[in-house]
Amino acid sequence: MTRKYFGTDGIRGRVGEAPITPEFVIHLGYSAGKVLTSSDWHLSKGERPAVLIGKDTRISGYMLESALQAGLSAAGVDVLLSGPMPTPAVAYLTRALRLQAGIVISASHNPFEDNGIKFFSALGAKLPDATEQEIEAGLNAPLKAMPSAQLGKARRVNDARGRYIEFCKSTFPNHLDLRGLRVVVDCAHGATYQIAGPVLHELGAEVVAIGIHPDGLNINHECGATHGAALQEAVRHHRADIGVALDGDGDRVIMTDGEGMLYDGDQLIYLVAKHRKQNGLLKGGVAGTLMTNLAIENGLKKLDIPFARANVGDRYVLELLQIKNWQLGGEGSGHIICLDKHTTGDGIISALQVLYAMRDSGKTLTELASDVTLYPQQLINVRVPKGFDAHNSLAIKTAQAEAERDLDTTGRVLLRASGTEPLIRVMVEGESGQKVKHWAEKIAEVVRNAAAGERSVEKALPN
């Protein structure tokens, strides 16, 4: 059974347009509540299931939170409200408070006009596909509230922020601190705005916090992990030792050194893996994605660290880690998963693992990263007819084979279809920037011509 609403990261869309409407979200809460109350959650007789709702700082969060709460309450589920809270914090608190599920209202790194809803299980992991399908199956059922005595209650979790701050700090070794470090942290006017700074400060750092004035409309706007320029400028202006930028819901991180040089998720994973390997702390290998820079794979090989690629998306990285029984993985966008520290990707905790490597080794971020330089990489998006399959084109196959022969072991070619738009993404990377540019443009042109030919055939066909 295919899912209509749930994607790889919950349900997401433009606010006010289906499915991100108050009416839909009430039904979503009700259906999710009915699934919870009908499942075997090992509850005592008469005990109601309880769910935590967290959100980021989008103005639409108030509306969607109320709708979700109403639907859950109508189904007989108690609701705990955390207010603005990072996605990984909701995953942690769901486990820590022994709740039946956690729900996050967020569209992550997207602009404020978008929003979304994602679910966590009692174990702090994303819901199994089967459970999401069960929730979807109940969306069209009539909303019939429980008798008044059985309606769910709601309350605020006033210590949610403090609990999560302490959890983050617990992932940093007790024998080390951040005294003497000036750290700029960019919270993207998002869910970490009252959390990331205190975590770093309580570990001893001198903290300069930016992106901490959310107004409901400015989340991710020219700041945070998707706009590193704001962090670079602040690090240089304040003469900081290091910079940390998170996205709107706190599950992504990028960093800068004291010169303002940006380090993406690929590089940060490499640094953490290298430190763990050198100290006998690395279990297994590292999971990346199809887009992980080849220089990272080659660098890990030199350190005798196994590496494997998953499809793009932190959900698939997590699945690969679980299959291989490894602990460390992620992607260049800044989703980093440390399964020995948390059940899901966590921007703050990932940054702390990099800071741990710095403090433990006595080296700066620049020094730690000096042995690996990312290969030039070019990505070109080519618009194609819906359903176009690049792998069926002999011309495209020939061009790709020619590029791979020329690049040999010093480069890589990847063609993949977008999961959301009618696009073929042409990615070429390698040691030679000149070769990368040449082959990316050549293959993209071949794809355009093949797609144009298919359009011509479509037009020639009778209606």
Curated annotation (Swiss-Prot):
Upper classification of the source organism reads: Bacteria, Pseudomonadati, Pseudomonadota, Betaproteobacteria, Nitrosomonadales
Q: What HAMAP family has UniProt attached to this entry? A: GlmM_B
* Modification type Phosphoserine: residues: 108
Q: What does this protein do?
A: Catalyzes the conversion of glucosamine-6-phosphate to glucosamine-1-phosphate.
The UniProt entry, under InterPro entries, shows: A-D-PHexomutase_a/b/a-I (IPR005844), A-D-PHexomutase_a/b/a-I/II/III (IPR016055), A-D-PHexomutase_a/b/a-II (IPR005845), A-D-PHexomutase_a/b/a-III (IPR005846), A-D-PHexomutase_C (IPR005843), A-D-PHexomutase_C_sf (IPR036900), A-D-PHexomutase_CS (IPR016066), Alpha-D-phosphohexomutase_SF (IPR005841)
Q: How is the cofactor bound?
A: Binds 1 Mg(2+) ion per subunit.
Enzyme Commission code: 5.4.2.10
Question: Which BP terms in the Gene Ontology apply to this protein?
Answer: carbohydrate metabolic process; peptidoglycan biosynthetic process; UDP-N-acetylglucosamine biosynthetic process
Q: Which cofactor does it need?
A: Mg(2+)
**UniProt keyword terms in alphabetical order:** Isomerase, Magnesium, Metal-binding, Phosphoprotein
What family classification does the UniProt entry report for this protein?
Answer: Belongs to the phosphohexose mutase family.
Q: How is it modified after translation?
A: Activated by phosphorylation.
User: Where does the chain bind Mg(2+)?
Assistant: 108, 247, 249, 251
Catalysed reactions, semicolon-separated? alpha-D-glucosamine 1-phosphate = D-glucosamine 6-phosphate
Q: Which GO terms describe its molecular function?
A: magnesium ion binding; phosphoglucosamine mutase activity; phosphomannomutase activity
Write out the catalytic residues in the record.
108
Record keyword Metal-binding present: yes
Q: What is this protein called?
A: Phosphoglucosamine mutase
Recorded GO CC terms: cytosol
